[in-house]
Amino acid sequence: MEKRRVVVKVGSSTITHESGLLNLKKLDELARVLSDLDNAGHEVLLVSSGAIAAGCGKMGLEQKPKELDEKQAMAAIGQCELMYIYDKMFSQYSRKVAQLLITKRDLDDEQLRSNALNTLQVLLKYKTIPIINENDSVAIDEIVYGDNDTLSAITARLIRADLLVLLSDIDGLYDADPSKCPH
């Protein structure tokens, strides 16, 4: 079997309960499957949403905040929780993970994009599974307009992935938010 470079994107609703708390069973299953891919000789990168949802869950908030600064604070709290759990889950399968937080500016600027690519390549060389997320605690445009589907596609192109897998609870592919544009 030939070695492939695979980018897997997981959405917030896929890895959290409705309460916003992280779904440990699903996170463990994700870590196991991605570790199996890694064991088979593939290079695996994970683009993970969930920081804001995890922050809200950890803080006991019943609803996601509407104000940007509160979303950013929940992202900061949740990102720590998310990476702690990912590190714990992947270590059960003898895998090392690394965090890479990216903003739109990092991808728009040629030098910053090159630095991100170099970091990803070195992490893969060291047999580490990079976990990528938008840096929602400092981002402005992304937290309002962006999503990790776009980030995963850009990452897949940047790293020259052979395959991009989007794990979501949305049925199908859309060119706009299906909750806002139902057609």
Indicate where each model-derived feature is located:
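Nucleotide/pyrophosphate-binding catalytic subdomain
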Residues: M1-H183
